């Protein structure tokens, strides 16, 4: 951080705009995925990263995933918590097993809810600035024939949709409505196959649909005509991009849209006249500011004034905070 000492007898205005690297460089968006094969098939997080990169955005993605597992498994797995603590994530995605989210409320509240809570409690403790997103998955191609209530696609999808939205409300989280974009493509473009031959996993086209839905949800913008390289039919690709745009952006309130938290940008001007100093904050994205004049006096005014009792060198300190972040900016002056 640049420092300079002011030695002016009469009147000086010092403009200091906060020389911090993140105020200039492209911000990275980091996402941790906790889930199973519906997340890692075709390395969907990597496709998301490619879409973002093609649109000039920088992403860091990582996973804590194991095939076929539910939230009970993830809540008892050490890697889940190691990954939560490993970075200040912008988003942490939670994806349960499709069958567990297709159960009645009573079963979900017993078999899933406590384990989702355990994971989210850890997120709120160790990564409080992270936005929690629930990855709403899709119904199996023909539903699950083992359970009469979800023995067809529509019944299974409806239950999955309902439970993920309920969990979003319970935990003040957002939803990535992959399952609803999936339904839109099934209904509007029946010639597009999204399913693996096993009738529940995604083929590459289905994973691209998931990635487009994540991109639209996280960045609040369309993936339409992005230049990422992906080996699917152009007409299928265009339909998926339009469907994710329509379903996500036309229903942001329904998905409990949670934009990425903005970084605090510190900055202040200093006006000096003799031993009198006037500070003016031009910082951004903060809730509270507190000043330290370097002589034992502090202030919480936005534009505080202070008279130093004696000449000398003083370190002016601006302390900014939001509900989960803090930034400090210091500037040294000399008062004659």
How does the language model describe each region?
Residues 259-336:
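Extracellular/lumenal mature domains of secreted and surface-exposed proteins
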Residues 37, 203, 284:
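Ser/Thr-glycine-rich phosphate-binding loops at phosphate-binding pockets of nucleotides
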Residues 28-32, 38-119, 128:
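Conserved SGNH/GDSL esterase-like catalytic core that processes O-acyl groups on lipids
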Residues 201, 211-271, 311:
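Conserved catalytic region of serine esterases and O-acyltransferases that act on ester linkages
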Residues 41, 204-211:
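Short alpha-helical patches at coil-to-helix transitions and adjacent helical residues
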Residues 37, 41, 47-55, 95, ...:
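Structured segments of extracytoplasmic/periplasmic soluble domains
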Residues 83-204:
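Alpha-helical cap/lid subdomain in secreted, periplasmic
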Residues 1-27:
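Bacterial Sec-dependent N-terminal signal peptides
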């Amino acid at each position: 951080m640049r420092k300079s000492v002011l030695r002016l007898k009469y009147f000086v205005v010092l403009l200091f705009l906060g020389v911090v690297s993140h105020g200039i460089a492209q911000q990275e968006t980091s996402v941790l995925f906790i889930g199973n094969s519906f997340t890692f098939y075709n390395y969907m997080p990597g496709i998301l990263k490619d879409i973002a990169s093609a649109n000039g955005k920088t992403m860091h993605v990582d996973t804590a995933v194991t095939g076929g597992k539910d939230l009970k498994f993830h809540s008892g797995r050490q890697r889940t918590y190691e990954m939560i603590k490993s970075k200040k994530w912008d988003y942490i995605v939670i994806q349960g097993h499709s069958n567990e989210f297709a159960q009645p409320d009573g079963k979900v509240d017993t078999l899933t809810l406590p384990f989702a809570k355990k994971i989210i409690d850890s997120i709120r403790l160790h990564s409080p600035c992270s936005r929690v997103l629930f990855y709403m998955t899709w119904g199996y191609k023909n539903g699950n024939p083992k359970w009469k209530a979800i023995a067809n696609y529509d019944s299974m999808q409806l239950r999955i949709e309902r439970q993920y939205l309920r969990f979003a409300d319970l935990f003040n989280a957002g939803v990535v409505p992959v399952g609803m974009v999936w339904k839109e493509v099934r209904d509007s473009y029946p010639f597009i196959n999204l399913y693996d031959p096993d009738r529940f996993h995604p083929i590459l086209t289905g994973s691209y649909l998931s990635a487009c839905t994540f991109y639209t949800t996280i960045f609040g913008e369309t993936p339409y005509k992005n230049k990422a390289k992906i080996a699917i039919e152009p007409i299928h690709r265009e339909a998926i991009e339009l469907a994710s745009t329509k379903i996500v952006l036309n229903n942001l309130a329904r998905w409990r849209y949670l934009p990425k938290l903005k970084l605090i940008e510190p900055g202040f001007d200093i006006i000096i006249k003799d031993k009198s100093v006037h500070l003016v904050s031009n910082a951004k994205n903060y809730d509270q500011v507190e000043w330290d004049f370097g002589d034992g006096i502090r202030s919480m005014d936005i534009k505080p004034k202070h008279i130093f009792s004696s000449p000398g060198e003083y370190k002016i300190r601006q302390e900014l905070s939001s509900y989960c972040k803090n930034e400090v900016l210091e500037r040294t002056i000399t008062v004659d």
